[in-house]
Amino acid sequence: MAKDKQSNDELGIQDLHREKTQQIITKPDLDYLEEGFIICSNCGCRIFLEDNPPLSISKCRECSNSNFIPLLIKDFWLYEPLGGGGMGSVYHSFFRQNSNVEAALKVLPRKMKNDNFLIESLIGEARSGSKFSNHPHLTKVYEYGLWEDEYYAAYEFIDGIRLDQIIESPVKRPDKQILLWALQILSAEQHIYDSGFLFRDLKPQNVMIDKNGNVKMIDYGLAITVQDALSGSNAENILGSPHYMPPERIVGAPESQYSEIYSLGMLLFHMISRQTFYSSEDIKHLVEKHVVSLRMNNPMMKLPANTNPELVRIVCKMINRNPSARYQTYKELGAELFREFKKTA
């Protein structure tokens, strides 16, 4: 589904993107890197790579300015940190033959790069993602493996902003934008399911909005096969964000599309109300609440009074504590969301 550029500008997505872009380091001079040095961003002094540990911060000997030391892995220069992702650290990277080709490379923290559990987590995430990531609203897995002594996974670099940053921004998003993003997430979820997997980690931090205003889902660390989800074979590992995790995961019950629909419902609630359904204090007792089957507070009482009643009804059904009372398939939910999307100005 195409996104209208004008409405994108009206929503301030482009402004948020420009603010973020101003903070990003310029593209590297590949000739310098291939010759074994970088240029201090403050004084222009040469800093030789061989004199510094890779992926570390080095102080310039002339001006004491802090500079990041890149690392070459296969065909990519890891050039600047992007942050943490699951079990690894993620770096903005550039193809060594062409700095216009970008990627996000995930590697293990320096002190744990030989940890077998972390290695399997890093490679396992990329292996799973490679089976379903070829979709316009999913971050593509380019390649993964072992290069010299480094395990790595190369992903599509998303030039955008995380959804949690958008939710926290001063501008409230209109229903039509929220519904569009929900439909794009559903499209990605359907593709993942059709490929034999469940995503299982839907939260604002794992949804990027690219510079064109469209969804890109990231981080496949909790994805498991549909078969494993239905069998409950992963029940001993209660992983995920408590604010968005379906209650059936907490009690070790089977998961399916209705579980992802619950997580999307909690995400929709967060986007509409600009607060999570459960407070931080609630989270401390959330497991106990689900186990003893305490009744969930009425979502209608927690959403803004001027919220579209049909959207309230849809969200309430999505986050029903009882899986059988929710929408059972992405297609069923998608039909209702799309109907509201067409009606919404």
Give the location of each predicted region.
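Activation-segment/catalytic-loop signature of the eukaryotic protein kinase fold
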Residues: 144
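Protein kinase catalytic-loop region centered on the HRD/HxD motif
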Residues: 187-197
